[in-house]
Amino acid sequence: AVITGACERDVQCGGGTCCAVSLI
């Protein structure tokens, strides 16, 4: 997971789906 200002795609969410919006 990377800190971004948008929806992040990560395998931790289940197959690289847009699952969370990171807050800096």
From Swiss-Prot:
Expressed by the skin glands. Keywords: Amphibian defense peptide, Disulfide bond, Secreted. It comes from the Eukaryota. It is found in: Secreted. It holds the Pfam family Prokineticin. Disulfide bonds join C7-C19. GO terms for biological process: defense response; positive regulation of insulin secretion. One of its GO terms (cellular component) is extracellular region. SUPFAM superfamilies: Colipase-like. Belongs to the AVIT (prokineticin) family. Stimulates insulin secretion by BRIN-BD11 cells in vitro. This is Prokineticin 1-like protein. It comes from Pelophylax saharicus. The lineage of its organism: Eukaryota, Metazoa, Chordata, Craniata, Vertebrata.
